[in-house]
C-alpha cells in the first residue's frame, strides 16, 4: 500500500483519507478487504497514529469502511452493487428541527461590526439595485468558499443568488420544466412537496431507508429528477452513505436526468471535513447544488444560492434571466465581507468544536 504524504501540506489526515478513498472507489481496495492497522500504517508513512486514526474515522463516518471487533477497519463500500455493508453497523437517527436550531447563534457583535464596516466602505452603492443573478462580489466569495470547503470548482456565472431555498426551488422547476417527473424524499420538508404541487408538475414520493432513498424505490421510479438532502434529510435526520451517494450519481448518468442537491446543515458536520457533495462526485454536469445561510447565520437573513451545471447557465438565462435578485444589495455585501474575512468559517469551526465537545460528554 503506497501512499504519498507531503508533511509540509496540511492537513495530513485529509491527504491520507483522499488517497484511501480513491483506492476504495476505484476497486483497488475491494469490499471486505482489511486496511492496515493504525500503528502499522503510521510507521510506514512516518506520521502519528492520531493522524491515521482521524483519516480512518472520517472514512468510517462516510460509509467507506467500518470497524470490526478483532479485525480492525475493513472496506464496507461495494462498488459492484453500490451499497455499503450494513450487517454490523448500527445506524443512529438524529432528527432535524424546523424551528429554533440547537446550534450556537452567529455572534451579533460580529454581524453588527460587519454591517457598520460595509456601510462605511460602500455608502451609496448599497442603495443601487443588485444585478439579477446577485452581486458579483458575493458570487465570487461563495465560489471561493465552495472550493475551499466543499470540493466544488465552478465559474462565477454558475452561481445564482436568491432569497432562500423555496425561491430557488421554484426557479429550478421553472428552468427544468414540466416535461420532467420529480422524485422527492419521503418524509421530507413539508414545503418541498407543497412547492412541487403548486407548480403543477408530476412528482413521486420516494421513501427513505436508513441510508438515503430506498433502493427499490430508486430503481423503479419514473422520475427523471430527484430532489435530495443527502447530508441530513429533514425531519428524519437520515444521512446518505458514501455508497448511496455513488448510487445517486450512477442513477443520474442516464440521459436527461438531474439531481437537485440541497446541502442542508452540511456545515455542521462533526468531522472536520463534511461528506462529499454529489456536485463534486458527479462528472456528468447534471447536479444542481443548493444551500442557504439560514442555519449558519440566521433564518431572517434570507440568502440562498444555487450552483448550476455549466450547460444549464444559458437555459436559466433564456428562461429566467429577467427575474430581479430578491436579496438586498446591502445584505449581499455584508455576507461577502463575512466570507472573505474568515468570520463565517470561524463561526462554523466554533460550532463544530462545541458539538464534538458535547458528544464527548
Predicted regions and their residues:
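Hydrophobic residues in beta-strands of the RecA-like P-loop NTPase core, especially within AAA+ ATPase
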Residues: 260-261
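Conserved core of the PLP fold type I
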Residues: 125-255, 267-268, 273-281, 285, ...
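Active-site PLP attachment segment
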Residues: 70, 282-315
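Active-site donor-binding loop signature of nucleotide-sugar glycosyltransferases
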Residues: 77, 98, 208, 230, ...
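N-terminal basic, amphipathic alpha-helical segments
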Residues: 1-118, 122, 127, 138-140, ...
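Short, well-ordered alpha-helical scaffold segment located
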Residues: 40, 232, 311-312
Amino acid at each position: 500500500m503506497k501512499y504519498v504524504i507531503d508533511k509540509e501540506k496540511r492537513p495530513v489526515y485529509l491527504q491520507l483519507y483522499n488517497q484511501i478513498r480513491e483506492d476504495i472507489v476505484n476497486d483497488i481496495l475491494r469490499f471486505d478487504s482489511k486496511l492496515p492497522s493504525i500503528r502499522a500504517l503510521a510507521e510506514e508513512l512516518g506520521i502519528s497514529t492520531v493522524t491515521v486514526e482521524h483519516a480512518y474515522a472520517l472514512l468510517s463516518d462516510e460509509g467507506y469502511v467500518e470497524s470490526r471487533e478483532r479485525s480492525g477497519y475493513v472496506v464496507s463500500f461495494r462498488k459492484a452493487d453500490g451499497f455499503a455493508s450494513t450487517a454490523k453497523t448500527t445506524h443512529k437517527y438524529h432528527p432535524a428541527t424546523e424551528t429554533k436550531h440547537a446550534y450556537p447563534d452567529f455572534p451579533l457583535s460580529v454581524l453588527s461590526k460587519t454591517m457598520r464596516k460595509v456601510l462605511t466602505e460602500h455608502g451609496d452603492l448599497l442603495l443601487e439595485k443588485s444585478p439579477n443573478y446577485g452581486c458579483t462580489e458575493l458570487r465570487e466569495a461563495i465560489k471561493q468558499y465552495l472550493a475551499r470547503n466543499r470540493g466544488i470548482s465552478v465559474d462565477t456565472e454558475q452561481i445564482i443568488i436568491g432569497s432562500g431555498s423555496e425561491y430557488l426551488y421554484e426557479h429550478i422547476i421553472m428552468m427544468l420544466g414540466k416535461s420532467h417527473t420529480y422524485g422527492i424524499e419521503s418524509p421530507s420538508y413539508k414545503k418541498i412537496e407543497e412547492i412541487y404541487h403548486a407548480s403543477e408538475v408530476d412528482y413521486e414520493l420516494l421513501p427513505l431507508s436508513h441510508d438515503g432513498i430506498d433502493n427499490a424505490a430508486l430503481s423503479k421510479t419514473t422520475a427523471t429528477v430527484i430532489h435530495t438532502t443527502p447530508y441530513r434529510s429533514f425531519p428524519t435526520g437520515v444521512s446518505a452513505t458514501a455508497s448511496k451517494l455513488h448510487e445517486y450519481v450512477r442513477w443520474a448518468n442516464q440521459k436527461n436526468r438531474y439531481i437537485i442537491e440541497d446541502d442542508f446543515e452540511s456545515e455542521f458536520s462533526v468531522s472536520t471535513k463534511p461528506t462529499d457533495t454529489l456536485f463534486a462526485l458527479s462528472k456528468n454536469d447534471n447536479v444542481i447544488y443548493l444551500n442557504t445561510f439560514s442555519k449558519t447565520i440566521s433564518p431572517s437573513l434570507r440568502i440562498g444560492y444555487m450552483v448550476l451545471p455549466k450547460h444549464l447557465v444559458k437555459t436559466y438565462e433564456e428562461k429566467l434571466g429577467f427575474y430581479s435578485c430578491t436579496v438586498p444589495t446591502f445584505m449581499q455585501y455584508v455576507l461577502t465581507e463575512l466570507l472573505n474575512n474568515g468570520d463565517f468559517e470561524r463561526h462554523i469551526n466554533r460550532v463544530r468544536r462545541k458539538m464534538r465537545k458535547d458528544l464527548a460528554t
